[in-house]
């Protein structure tokens, strides 16, 4: 049976999301490099793995998946008893799982669109020889501040976003945060005490440090 393969780019936020999950589980895998600058993700053979042309794609034996958050959920369930438990303490507790699911949805729809745009403006644009649009940065930082205010309130009640243990809800945030900590946007995290503590906790995890 073939092993685990991740088809993506090591600088991609979505690819990193999957890589961190694999490292948390201490799983062996192969990262198959997809060169985004050359548009390899928009043509075969990659399109046969993800018809929407976005990294990463994933294989575990005969199983083929795409969409990073679906992949991390598969990893968390399929390898629940290996490495770090990325689910709630009682993974069969539907109420606990629903809390974690809310957190994952908030990350996907409220945090990531803003954080990824800020990373693009302040980091990735320079890679492509483009200029940062400071007006866009200001607009997106205002949006991110509102999200982080919600997080600050939540983290005053719990150590992590879904409760007292580290879960996929927290993990999904890590790659974008890693990038933003290297930009002026870092201030939005550091000026909120509990968010700042949470960021330090999740970004210092050994699995997180392996993808920086």
From Swiss-Prot:
GO terms for cellular component: apoplast; chloroplast; chloroplast stroma; cytosol; endoplasmic reticulum; intracellular membrane-bounded organelle; plant-type vacuole; plasma membrane. Residues 93-212 form the GST C-terminal domain. Induction: By ethylene, auxin, glutathione, salicylic acid, copper, paraquat, acetochlor, metolachlor and the pathogens P.syringae and Hyaloperonospora parasitica. Glutathione binds at residues 12-13, 41-42, 54-55, 67-68. CDD domains: GST_C_Phi, GST_N_Phi. It is found in: Cytoplasm, Cytosol; Microsome; Endoplasmic reticulum. GO terms for molecular function: camalexin binding; glutathione binding; glutathione transferase activity; peroxidase activity; protein domain specific binding; quercitrin binding; salicylic acid binding. InterPro entries: Glutathione-S-Trfase_C-like, Glutathione-S-Trfase_C_sf, Glutathione_S-Trfase_N, GST_C, GST_Phi_C, Thioredoxin-like_sf. Expressed in the root-shoot transition zone and root tips. Its main location: cytoplasm. It catalyses: RX + glutathione = an S-substituted glutathione + a halide anion + H(+). SUPFAM superfamilies: GST C-terminal domain-like (SSF47616), Thioredoxin-like (SSF52833). GO terms for biological process: auxin-activated signaling pathway; defense response; response to cadmium ion; response to cold; response to oomycetes; response to zinc ion; toxin catabolic process. Its EC number is 2.5.1.18. Keywords: Auxin signaling pathway, Cytoplasm, Detoxification, Endoplasmic reticulum, Microsome, Oxidoreductase, Peroxidase, Plant defense, Stress response, Transferase. Residues 2-83 form the GST N-terminal domain. PANTHER family: GLUTATHIONE S-TRANSFERASE F2 (PTHR43900:SF48), GLUTATHIONE S-TRANSFERASE RHO (PTHR43900). Belongs to the GST superfamily. Phi family. Binds auxin, endogenous flavonoids and the phytoalexin camalexin and may be involved in regulating the binding and transport of small bioactive natural products and defense-related compounds during plant stress. Binds a series of heterocyclic compounds, including lumichrome, harmane, norharmane and indole-3-aldehyde. In vitro, possesses glutathione S-transferase activity toward 1-chloro-2,4-dinitrobenzene (CDNB) and benzyl isothiocyanate (BITC). Homodimer. This is Glutathione S-transferase F2.
């Amino acid at each position: 049976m073939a092993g685990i393969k991740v088809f993506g780019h090591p600088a991609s936020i979505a690819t990193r999301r999957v890589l961190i999950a694999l490292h948390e589980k201490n799983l062996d895998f192969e990262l198959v490099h997809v060169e985004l600058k050359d548009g390899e993700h928009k043509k075969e053979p990659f399109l046969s793995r993800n018809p929407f042309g976005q990294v990463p794609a994933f294989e575990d034996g005969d199983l083929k998946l795409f969409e990073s958050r679906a992949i991390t959920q598969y990893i968390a369930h399929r390898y629940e008893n290996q490495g770090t438990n990325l689910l709630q303490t009682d993974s069969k507790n539907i109420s606990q799982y629903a809390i974690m699911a809310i957190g994952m949805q908030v990350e996907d729809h409220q945090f990531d669109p803003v954080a990824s745009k800020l990373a693009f403006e302040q980091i990735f644009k320079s890679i492509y020889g483009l200029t940062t649009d400071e007006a866009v940065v200001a607009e997106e930082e205002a949006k991110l501040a509102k999200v982080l205010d919600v997080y600050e309130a939540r983290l005053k009640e719990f150590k992590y976003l879904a409760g007292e243990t580290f879960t996929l809800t927290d993990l999904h945030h890590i790659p974008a945060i890693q990038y933003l900590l290297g930009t002026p946007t870092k201030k939005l995290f550091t000026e909120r005490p509990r968010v700042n503590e949470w960021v330090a906790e999740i970004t210092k995890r050994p699995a997180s440090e392996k993808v920086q």
